[in-house]
């Protein structure tokens, strides 16, 4: 289903200037920005304002009062239905992109759930989370979509690394792992490496965790889209 009312959210922290620069370069159309506090105590109130939570809560109470003194079957059933709700009314967006990580991301997700944002009507997306399984257990969002490296290769690399060193690697090491492969490819193809220009291949290069392409002096990694579903990472 096509989404037309998107909000891109990110925290006010040390990376704010960098994130805003990247967002500006994307030239996104019809996308609203929402900057929130990195303080969880302030965040909840900000999310309530974003989702018009107080008004939607009042809408529900007013609607319930219309049926409280009625005794006909239809009114009783409607009141029973309303009693199952927390708010009444829609939010003014149908998709969210959250540029955040770790506990800060979980605080945002928890606040959105608390503010009764429908997971059936609003698409939740975020940036690469490196298959952080704690997302499964520390919030009640059923489905979150995000781009990431190849999950199978990522898992195989982690297991191989652990078997060798008895600790799990951080995410940077797997990027270095593919970087070494890229250096070897350039050396084998050209016979030597003299400058960065030796890495500007026309063809795409498939690494352990993804496919890389080279254009305008930049290296771009092609990522897959995954979603969390029933405590699993599913390639979308």
Kindly give the residue locations of the regions a language model identified.
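Sec/Tat-exported extracytoplasmic proteins
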Residues: 1-3, 23-27, 54, 100, ...
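Extracellular/periplasmic Venus flytrap/periplasmic-binding protein
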Residues: 1-103
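Generic signature of mature, soluble extracytoplasmic domains
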Residues: 3, 103-106, 112-121, 131-132, ...
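Stable alpha-helical elements in mature extracytoplasmic
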Residues: 15-22, 39, 43-46, 104-107, ...
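Segments of small-molecule ligand-sensing domains
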Residues: 165-177, 184-233
